[in-house]
């Protein structure tokens, strides 16, 4: 997948004047083509060039960064999140409003997260790989970067759509599964796997 370049970034004033339109379009795109919910408190947002373009534009808008060298440094960081061929890259997001741990509602904590906790279930189980693996990454905030490496067989299952595909997360007493991935989302992920 092509990396973001400085020429792709709108000047701050241009982006600001169209931000509402971009934001609404971005949210619709995420919800329909890029987001998977696991229960009520966890989401996966699969990143690609389009999602990261908006994210970077927002960072530049909020920080008022306009220096091309600084902008390029930011692009270099975010370009690492653009998936390579045969890879799905996602943000793993834990809702900060998640209710506290109770016996009937075991809470999930990022401190308990390991790559094999989260799996893509096709006709086989594919564990995720943590992009952020340091202990301090796992103890801060409500988000992680993860990726899935798919072989040709798994890619064809995503494309074909006849075999169910979903995500499953288990840790200690916590278990959450997504619904079967809808066609639009599978097609969007298939595009990621080709680039």
What kind of region is each of these model predictions?
Residues 1-89, 96-195:
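Long, contiguous binding/interaction regions
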